[in-house]
Amino acid sequence: MAANLGEPINNEWVQQYNSGVNRESGMELPMQENPEWEKARQALASISKANATSADKGSESGQTNSQFVSQQGEAILQQQQYYQWYSQYNYSYPYNYYYQMNMYNGYNTPGQYGMPGNYQSMSSQSGQHQGNLAQPPVPGLEDSSMSYSNVQSPVSLCNTQTASHQQVNHSMTKPCIQGRNAGNQSNPHSSSNQPNYSQQSFNEGPKQKKGQQLWNRMKHAPGSGGFKFNIQKRPLVMANQNFASSEHHDNSAGQQQQQATHMHHPLQQPQQQPTIEKITEHGNNSSKPEDWPQAMKEYVQRCFTSCESEEDKDRTEKLLKEVLQARLQDGSAYTIDWSREPLPGKDGGKESPKKKRWEQTTLQTSHGSTITITQSPRGGGNSTNAATLRGRGSFIKKFGNRNVFMKESSSSSSAGSRSRSRSPSHSPHRRYRRSDSDSDSAYSGNETRDGGRRNFQKARGRGGHMDRGGRGRLQKGKRSDQAFSKKNRKKNPVAMELEDPEKEFKKEKRAARFQHGHGPKKLRMEPLVLQINNMDPSAADNLDWDEIKIVGNSQDITKHYLRLTCAPDPSTVRPVPVLKKSLTMVKADFKNKQDYVFACEQMKSIRQDLTVQGIRTEFTVEVYETHARIALEKGDHEEFNQCQAQLKSLYAENLAGNVGEFTAYRILYYIFTKNSGDLTTELAHLTKELKADACVAHALSLREAWALSNYHRFFKLYRQAPRMSGYLIDKFAERERKAALKAMIKTFRPLLPVSFVQSELAFANEEECQSFLAPLSLVYAGNDASQIDCKLSLAVLPNI
């Protein structure tokens, strides 16, 4: 076998097996068994003692399956099958008593009776056996990358066959991920099984590359099966490669480079930096650390040197796994300048300026290329409407050929492809979903990194196969993806937050309010509007009259009331002695002339002068009590209510005045307005001294009769009202008389005398009672209106 390594390629063999290249059916010419195979079987039979019994059975039938086991962290079984060629029938497959299978390789048609092909395509395996021992390839369908070239990339396949009669599907076998040094070789084992004739399924046709003919993918020249070269070639970097292309295709250039590097270097250094070993231990497509460029090794050491804690080292290790794996996968690790490559995590932590939801975000890369992302205005579905990638920049260097912006589907990936490898860092990142960065930047470091991993992992699972419309197949992963997207929309503040363009201006404006807070206060020079006793606090502009000390010097007895529009002039403000004279004049004038308009204007001007000078004395109480009595007499309950509010505040300052009288007025006013809340509060704050007051006692008795609907007692107390309580009772006396009349008509039958109504409802005379009953449309008995027919009057009670 060692002599075969140096033999040149047999030209006759090449002409013989290349004669059918241009055939349309892709069939092979008759061939004879290679005598070198018998030598290989004998050599393997002497080594494999564990499977001697099965090997003897295989030698009797003339059919052998060679299995080479390379224990590099996990058992990798390589199977090869050989079967006889029926040359008398002029085809390369066994005669199965029906038409030839795989005659038209380009058609994707089902097998016999509408079923898929029973025999799948075989992949020839070339394994190394302790040094220079090699075996020629099986004349079956090889991997599309195994052509006559200087660099050969044998693909290691996981052996899924455990029984002798179990069929092996080579086309669906996943590539074994080797994460340890290829130099640690183990003893190979061989086993032979029963004949297992394989034939390519018609459904596997689209998965093979179309650039090579069938013979070039199947054959090696005799004696050249173990002839290998160790010339490394930098794979072609495809500029228009999609993000997820390397994840969905098994025969990518990155895998060929990785597998060729593992198989062509049997001798490796036993010692290596522990940090680099950690990075390549779980990598699925990365090459050996010895084959890395020197600048790339120095870059890794620089990254770990910059770490300050163990957490930083762990984070850096995770980032380097992704960055280096992506670089080695697309071949850019040999082309980029590692000395200028930014350290992972250092360039992604800066916040980018916040963009609006519908605004295009442009990312500048290190090589001058740009990535433009248009954010979708709605959550859910595809989060990216347009993503334009020009060239390769730092963003692609960080994440490799993965579309981190796609949530549930990728328009650039193939429709029926499925990822056949799972990232080793899949599960740990699920713990960090609740610790994403809440930065304002839509593409901050932590948020982009974690979000990109989550979205990419979701696209790789079962629920990640979505069509272009955003609807996926009904699988188990779909519900979890939808639940996660709903949960992400609720807790992700970036997707729903709108930028306030005046945010900074408002902050500066708020900060400017406190710049001069400790300085001396100055008088307000702008015009002011002051309304005395106005319930709207904005009308007086929140003036603090305690700090504005004004002493008036005006001697005018009368003064027109004007609302203040500026700081008051002392020459227009009257002092207290002048105000006392003015109050005496107003009382006399109102008593004689009953001119309420003039009296109210003068009383309001007196109150204004007292307010601007900050005077709150017994004289102030007298002024407000006088104004309240005048307003109560004339029925101006709005002005009376304002005076009552000021009097309550003045009484709370222990200023002398008619506290009992106006407390009774306040109780009666609450009965008038039916304000039960304030009435209850007022009753709760009554002291024993106030309850003993005649006015307060009368008001409490009246309130009790009103609450019990005891109209007889109510109108009896109405006739006995002290001081000016009768004026307040007059406000709601008519309302209570109507309620009492309804109760009387319902109670008395058949007739109700009008004289009885007059006495019970506290009318002064019969004429006043008739004027009250006339608008009510009551029915009277007889021609005179002296008696009310209660039965007939029931119909008009709802209108009263």
UniProtKB/Swiss-Prot annotation:
Residues 338-352 have a biased composition (Basic and acidic residues). Residues 636-800 form the PCI domain. Residues 419-433, 508-519 have a biased composition (Basic residues). Residues 118-149, 175-229, 245-273, 335-394, 407-519 are annotated as: Disordered. GO terms for cellular component: nucleus. It holds the Pfam family SAC3_GANP. InterPro entries: PCI_dom, SAC3/GANP/THP3, SAC3/GANP/THP3_conserved. Residues 252-261, 360-387 have a biased composition (Polar residues). It comes from the Eukaryota. Coiled coil: none annotated. PROSITE patterns: PCI (PS50250). Residues 120-131, 184-201, 409-418 have a biased composition (Low complexity). PANTHER family: 80 KDA MCM3-ASSOCIATED PROTEIN, LEUKOCYTE RECEPTOR CLUSTER MEMBER 8. This is Leukocyte receptor cluster member 8 homolog. It comes from Xenopus laevis. The lineage of its organism: Eukaryota, Metazoa, Chordata, Craniata, Vertebrata.
